[in-house]
Amino acid sequence: MADDLVKFGDEATWDLICSGRSIGIFQAESPLVQSWLRRIKPRNIWEMSAVVAAVRPGVLASGYADQYVINKDDPDNIPSYGNDIIDDIFKSTNGTLLYQETLMALGSRLAWPHLEENKRLVQVDKLRKAVGKKNQQKIMEVGREFVEGCTKNGVDKELSDKLFELIKNCGRYAFNLSHAAKYARIGYETAYFKCHYPLEFFTVYL
């Protein structure tokens, strides 16, 4: 039903979201999320997804959320790693690591592209699981494998170490992009109803 009533790309709805006046909006009611809506100022579902991901503990603690805003406001600030594959992986997130899919792409395309598909997927999932837990031994083990894989495929060791530090810093709490996008869509839909059907919206909300 929502798809029949909601107009995506509605400027008034995005204005409401960007204002941070998000009481009643799905996954956006907390003061923390309100502040990030005002900072990121999303104007599409992908930028709204970034808000959902940005408020995760690991992303906040690592400073990646702040860096996302800085780079979004000034694209010239987005770093180049001197590697087309790395730059391409980070392109959709303004040069930052926001999602689990980003760390998985680093593993798949940089560390283990030479492996058969099944073995590559197993290794990438091992990376995802390792950084999602507190077991430092497993993190160090998969870190060595990641760095060895990267250097084997032409990435210098210093850059490989730096990439794994990025992964390790926020991987434990990095959000899944598909979940973030779904939350963002529902958030937009509830914002649309709040903006255009306020009586009905607040009747249900209250």
Give the residues covered by each predicted segment:
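Noncatalytic, beta-rich nucleic-acid-contacting surfaces in large DNA/RNA-processing enzymes
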Residues: 1-206
